[in-house]
Amino acid sequence: MQLDRTAIVIALRTPPELLDLSLVVIREFAGRLLLFALVGVIPFAILNAILLEPLRHYDQLSLLSASTTSNQWFRFQYLWWMALLVMLEAPLAMLGLTLALGNTVFLSDYSRRNWLNPIWIQRGAILWILGILRGAIPALLVTAYMALTPELHRSFMVIVWLTIAGIILLLFRGINPFAPEILALEQTKLSSDPNRPNAMTYSKRTQWLRKAQADANGIGVTTILLSAAATLMLCLCAAFLLGVLIGTWKWGWWMDLIIYPTSLWMTALWTTVLRFLVYVNTRIRAEGWDLELKLRAEAQRLSEFQGAPNRG
């Protein structure tokens, strides 16, 4: 990793500066980031739409329900379930984007043929940490069981328990937020090699970075609030454009099936970029990257001064 060859300036930044920089990075590399994000998002988006399709028949569910006759409750159930799935799936779905961010920011030479090699090498650890422990795969299994059990389509207890589990997993993710970067970019192993007992492992690395993330928790709370606001804003803007262009001002199936999930994934893309920048900022604070660059610049300046001809 060459710290003197980066797409952004290596410097310690405040939380407001990181929020601003995340938007700048998206603006500058929008095409590339969107391409790599779609590779992971499309399979999950299609799977979510298929599994949640039984919950989208609001009128039918309200007619069959004995507890409520309002279809708005069932619409809320669908929207909330979709949001929970995207939240739990985002770290795994956006892993390709995380790799692209690392290669882009640090100007690494890579080809489109082998850019997924780090994920394939770490597939076991990624599946265990991001797929199982972070809740993406269990949430999909619960959703699939719900989709195959008609009685659960009208039961709000499943979504209540899924919400509680999602909150717990979100808190757990806040303790160790940089799992995608550690696994994909640093290629850290889950267990140490018997031949190298002192090698860095995933648990050691997360503990070490946890001590250095002074402002990460504050940024995490801000990110959650901004994500909710951004998703709502994107949906309202899309609804307004549809109303102006085609004269449809009602919240129809296209909002539930296309625009709302797209807004969620767009917000997930932004949070992935922000998390990566916080990760870089944490390493700058912990490893003194900015000091290393200053020492390199001073050494280069001294070398140029010593090599200059004596004009006296």
Which ranges hold each PLM region?
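Hydrophobic alpha-helical membrane segments
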Residues: 1-312
